[in-house]
From Swiss-Prot:
Annotated source species: Porphyra purpurea
Name of the gene encoding the protein in the UniProt record: ycf41
Name of the molecule in the record: Putative single-stranded DNA-binding protein ycf41
All copies of domain SSB, residue ranges: 1-98
Subcellular location: Plastid, Chloroplast
Residues making up the signal peptide according to the UniProt record: none
GO cellular component, one term: chloroplast
InterPro entries: NA-bd_OB-fold, Primosome_PriB/ssb
Gene3D superfamilies hit by this protein: Nucleic acid-binding proteins
Keyword Secreted: no
Keywords, in A-Z order: Chloroplast, DNA-binding, Plastid
Keyword field contains Cell membrane: no
Gene Ontology MF: a single term: single-stranded DNA binding
Length: 111
């Protein structure tokens, strides 16, 4: 797993599932800020959040996702084929991205 931060624009929140061990999996369709490629992202969130927080994600232009990226063989194959990518990301924090000039982030939720 690689620790990293993603700056993405949320295009669509497809689904929210709760697993048996109380984790939440959110399927998002997003676009990276520096690239125009569309990405399907699975966010694994260890603490349960209310649906209102996920509705807030759609309202923001860009968000910063902090956590660890899980690599798998299917991800590597899709990267080589240059198609829509699927990423699985363990989330520790999600920030609202304002502007680099204001240099302020608002913490939405913390692990």
């Amino acid at each position: 797993m690689n620790k990293c931060n993603l700056l993405v624009q949320i295009l669509q929140c497809k689904s929210v599932k709760t697993t048996s061990n109380e984790n939440q999996i959110i399927k998002l369709k997003a676009r990276f800020k520096k690239r125009n490629k569309v990405v399907a992202i699975d966010l694994l969130i260890w603490n349960r959040q209310s649906l209102e927080i996920f509705k807030l994600l759609k309202k923001f232009d860009y968000i910063i996702i902090e956590g660890k990226l899980h690599r798998s063989e299917t991800t590597d194959i899709k990267l080589m084929l240059n198609q829509q990518k699927d990423l699985v990301f363990s989330t520790s924090r999600i920030f609202k991205y304002k502007s680099l000039l204001k240099n302020k982030d608002i913490d939405l939720f913390i692990k």
